Every structure is written in structure tokens, then in C-alpha cells.
Amino acid sequence: PPEEPALEAKVPEDSDMRGQWGKRPQETIDRANELLDDFASLLTKRGIRVDRPTPIDFSQPATTPDFHADSQFGCMPPRDVLLTVGSEILEATMSYRCRWFEYLCYRPLMQKYWEEDKNFKHESAPKPRLTDADYHADYLSEKIGVEKRLKWTAEKFFVTTEEEPLFDAADVLRFGKDLVVQHGFTTNLKGIEWIRRHFSDHRVHAVNFPGDPYPIHIDATFTPLRPGLILNNPQRSLPDEQRKMFEKNDWEIIDAAQPAHNSPPPLCYSSTWLSMNVLVLDPKTVCVEKSEVYQAEQMDKLGMEVIPIDLRDAYAFGGGLHCCTADVNREGSCEDYFPNQT
């Protein structure tokens, strides 16, 4: 998509993506679709039902009475849009203008689930207006450097304002009765408060990671593997004060292994830390991108069965193994993993 207030602050100054927008080369699209098809096939063979979205024409502009974006994004990462809590799937507000209509790709599935399951609840958070008031104009990246941005993120001063509730589903982690939500570029405090009021039977905790100059989505920063164990990006450590809830409930937070790559693929929004963007199938089984040998080795040492998945050539379309999936239904009940609250 073209630059917009939320995107300008995410794309590093030296990125190849600067100034580029429009349809990607067809061979890269075909390759990404091939890899996603293979991943879906592997999951299906393991007895997992896999449903796929219905893409719209993302080359169309995204236009509302409040804004105009010359093109849209895509629907590779459903994790960003859909949040499943209990019997409910909630559509996030989204904070990028180019992603405002992305929810439409999942509406056929939402209708299908509603017809299949009388207990299913389909909810949509209030769509934000995304006017200029939603963004700090002085966050334009050509005016600042990484050091200043790190200072701002440490002070919890992000590109998004508190004009209205904003959140992406990929900023939310589910721990049974507790929801952990990252405060950053794509989720503001009003968004976290909206989640808290909406899921009133859950405990909602805000976290932030000062070492990340581009804090967007949590899965390449803080990744639960099984009850009692979490991977944390060593460059984006959870602050000591926010660790107390985990420590009081005997959770171990360990540093993730280093990425196998020194740079992300061409025209990719994400960092090399997609290495820890893994898909946990159950407490003993995890999908890891096949080139991320160090992360796979760490998982093996932690006693997990590692399933290598070829997905790196699809990263540029929206992220890694967790990004390109969204849970609809998992076995089990809602447990209390943090009975000792701070």
C-alpha cells in the first residue's frame, strides 16, 4: 500500500519499501500462495480443519468520508484482524487505513460459523474513523531517527493518539482468563480499555517493550509456548515491573534464539525476529520456519516436536507462521494460569 500516517512510522528510513506501492510481482504472489497452500495441507493432514479467507480486490482504493488510501493491503495475516476468545470471534478495529476493509475477507467464514454453531458469537469492534487526529503528525520518519524513536517508545509515545479506540488482534495474547495486550503503534490505551470492558469476565493486562523502535504486534516479541514458559525477544525485554505477574505464578520467561538471517526478505514489513513467530499446535508441538535453524534447535532442547515449514518467501505479504493463521476453535477449557494477581 502507499504511505499513510501509520505506515510511515513503521517503515525504517533505509528500507527498500520507501516510496514503493502497488501490486507485487506476480511470481512472488504465486510463490507465496504455493507456500500457504502447502502449510494448509500439512495442517489438514494432522487433523486440523483449515478454512481460507475470500480475498477482495486489494488494488482498489480504500475510501471513506474521512480518508482515502490509493490501494489496500491483503489478507495473508488473519491473526491481525480476528481475535477468538471463548465462543466469540471479534473483528479488531485495525489502525491502518489501507486495512480498513480487510474484515470483508472473513465475513463468509463468520456467516458459516454462525450457521454451524448456535453458541458462536460474531462481534465487530467499532470501526474507527482514522482521521488525521488519530496520528501524531510529528512521527513522520524522515524527521526523526531511531534513537529518538526509542526514547519515544520508552515514554509510551507512539504514532497513534488516544482520539478513539484502536487495536489490532495481533497485539493480544490469550492466557485463559487473562488477556495480555501490547500498547504500541497499532493498539492504543483506549483500545485496551475497550477490550477490557468488552471481555469483562477476563483480566486484561497492558504491556510494552521499550527496546522496540517499531512496536507493532506482539508475536515476534513475546511468545507463549506452553503453560509456564514464554519466549521473549532479547532485544525487547519485558520491563521488570510487568514481569511480576508471571513470576508470582511460576512462569519462566527465556530469551529467544537468534534469527538465522541478518535481514528480512525483500519488501518485507517485518524484522528478522519473525524467527520466533511460530505456531504452537499443542504444548509439545510447534511449527517453525524451516530456515530458522537456531530457533528450531532451541525448541528441540525445550522438549518440543518441531515441524519445519517453508514460509520465508511469503513473509513480505504479512508475516510468519502465527501471523498467517487465526485460531477458530481449540480443545480445552478456559483456565486460570495466573491465580496470584499483583
Where are each of the predicted segments found?
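The feature marks the mature, well-folded catalytic cores of soluble enzymes
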Residues: 1-342
